[in-house]
Amino acid sequence: MKLTSKGRYAVMALVDLARFDNINPVSLRDISLRQGISLNYLEQIFSKLRKKEIVQSVRGTQGGYVLNKKAREIKLNNIFDAVDEKVKTVQCNKESKKGCNGKSTKCLTHNLWDELENHINNFFEKKSLEDLVKDNIERRI
């Protein structure tokens, strides 16, 4: 399974945003400094998040970004979908008639990896930004 930096950084940046969302809009520069993520990379990520209406931008000197929904309503799978991140544990195309690796049947461990992928996706469908913010606060105490 491969989760790219784009997906990890999108989640990290949104958790940061969710922590400060009730105060004022948060600038990408502030997120960049706090999380050690390139500002240019954050701009690319937030462009996708804005298009999928996960965040909205606020213009002006006190501008920045705010969540478009409550943190509890934004699930990790929504974030991954917004930045075109797919969790894939099987190498084959599940819909292929050829099976795994171009053969006529599935590979011996196909069902294992397919089941793992389902568990991961179910986890991401249930876990919200609010959960991650609360978890972060509890671990710091």
Predicted regions and their residues:
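Short amphipathic alpha-helical interface segments
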Residues: 10-22
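Basic amphipathic alpha-helical segments that dock to polyanions
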Residues: 45-50
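Conserved segment of winged-helix/HTH DNA-binding domains
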Residues: 71-96, 109, 115
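Beta-hairpin "wing" of winged helix-turn-helix
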Residues: 54-62, 66-67
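A short alpha-helical element within helix-turn-helix/winged-helix DNA-binding domains
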Residues: 26-35
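Key DNA-contact positions within bacterial/archaeal DNA-binding proteins
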Residues: 40
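C-terminal regulatory/oligomerization modules of transcriptional regulators
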Residues: 94-141
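The C-terminal cap of the DNA-recognition helix in HTH/winged-HTH DNA-binding domains
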Residues: 19-22, 33, 51
